[in-house]
Amino acid sequence: MRTLVFDVAGEYGQFKKPYSPMSPVSYPFPPPTAVLGMLGAIAGYDKTEYHERLGWRTARIGIAPQAPVRAFRAAINLLQTKDGVDSYFRPRAGQNTHTQVPFEFLREPRFRLYVAGLKEDATNRLAEQLASGRTAYTVSL
């Protein structure tokens, strides 16, 4: 079984916990679904096909933090765009279209990912992309 080992890092990251819709908090590390999404973006697989193309049922993922996990909260202004605004997103009189929501982010996250058990063609494609430093889609944390 071939294992791919590579680092991912960024200025900020957020891996939203699904049970926190009103005040989004983040996992301290990328969950397996996020790692599979990153792999799909690197390899260039569409979001509707990457699970099957990678072989997610047999995938084995390990994550090792390479920097201390530092979290912070920031209030984000959300703008309601369905009702109450015109086509230029200007609020109509008497209607509040902004909502401030505190989001939790990770500051300067850095992780080493260990990935094994992928389909052979997907492993070869990922290894080639990683070795050349290219991605098909932009990877975000």
Sequence positions of predicted segments:
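Internal, well-folded beta-alpha domain core
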Residues: 66-141
